[in-house]
């Protein structure tokens, strides 16, 4: 077989004509120091703040400190395999998470990767986790109610869609229970919920997920978890990942509830990172920008104007106090950022008042304008009744001979406390809340023994469901109270059938 020179030259010419010079340019640096989840890298001169970088073993990192001679990078994963001298590559991307309908019902980590064993999440949409909060002109004042299903909150400390309401209290006072009940009550309310667990035990997160699944709430909930065993950078990123997933729905005109459980652990993780990055410490060893850490997160909760689609994000951040001290650094910071706080007290919790809400220290700064008219009317005097009861209760312990007016206030107060108690995972529709509070404030419960109040309440709801469904439907549809004589007839009709225990 002879080889022809022309064929060879033709082939070479074709190769030369089709040759495409593809040069990939990577900005790379070298690890000069690594430890405790932090790497110092030399050579990434053009690196952006917050940019993702990739280590040679495939683990991602996030640029935090841009210094003259090196870059301080927090490592978003296992760092044991990273060695001094390893190559680090810029990605040119800011930290992003996947977003969209596909995440609903899933449990993900702060990078948006599924951790529930149900396979990959098939979404091509992503959003950067750090984004600008809506401006003044893009917002609208809070005016729609967000019903939590908890009598004490919906009556005394109402929350509106787009509000930021802090839930604050010691450990084991029922903070998570308040949030879970609120999520359960959003069923059929056209709300999407995002539950962000920061630094929780994995067993606790599993318990929350099972509660949501049992009540059918996972159908509209995304769970973002960075458990206590995860590295500090993931705990720091978790709340931003959660609100980013919520923003996708808000900007599409939907209503979202985001629960951050809890921001104290995020602040502690950020303190750890900052100290390892050698940033100067301030009060309680927190860095100087710990206020900005929380303010830029919570400012992203908003009620958007009609021009922007009228969506909303309601934020329920948690802060854990030590021995009820709400004047510590992180609690005062978050109180000053939010639109009110719900203070849960351990003394009340252990004395059997659950939810253990301290009505005197709790406040909702903007929720009043979102409350339905019926609730406003029946709950108007409730806070004062409760405050004067707590005051008189202290005096009543010293002497037994009280005048009639004082005794009447004490009796009403004891019944008010009893009515505001509620069982776990049993949120109550707003119309039923109005019905029992109407009976309480109009004095229909004054002759019922305190021990029978809870039983009275349950049987009263059953009676209304069977005989006066129109009254409940009227409150639910119009938001107004029915005529006094109709309500009076219903309550008196039930009282005739109710048998007190003594």
From Swiss-Prot:
Stored InterPro entries: ATP_synth_asu-like_sf, ATP_synth_asu_C, ATP_synth_asu_C_sf, ATP_synth_F1_a_nt-bd_dom, ATP_synth_F1_asu, ATPase_a/bsu_AS, ATPase_F1/V1/A1_a/bsu_N, ATPase_F1/V1/A1_a/bsu_N_sf
Catalytic activity: ATP + H2O + 4 H(+)(in) = ADP + phosphate + 5 H(+)(out)
Subcellular location, principal: membrane
EC number: 7.1.2.2
Site (Required for activity): 362
Coiled coil: none
Pfam family, one: ATP-synt_ab_C
Residues binding ATP, per UniProt: 169-176
GO CC terms of this entry: plasma membrane; proton-transporting ATP synthase complex
Known partners and oligomeric status: F-type ATPases have 2 components, CF(1) - the catalytic core - and CF(0) - the membrane proton channel. CF(1) has five subunits: alpha(3), beta(3), gamma(1), delta(1), epsilon(1). CF(0) has three main subunits: a(1), b(2) and c(9-12). The alpha and beta chains form an alternating ring which encloses part of the gamma chain. CF(1) is attached to CF(0) by a central stalk formed by the gamma and epsilon chains, while a peripheral stalk is formed by the delta and b chains.
Family of this protein: Belongs to the ATPase alpha/beta chains family.
UniProt-listed PANTHER family: ATP SYNTHASE SUBUNIT ALPHA, MITOCHONDRIAL
Purpose of the protein: Produces ATP from ADP in the presence of a proton gradient across the membrane. The alpha chain is a regulatory subunit.
Protein name, UniProt field: ATP synthase subunit alpha
Organism whose genome encodes this protein: Bacillus velezensis (strain DSM 23117 / BGSC 10A6 / LMG 26770 / FZB42)
Gene: atpA
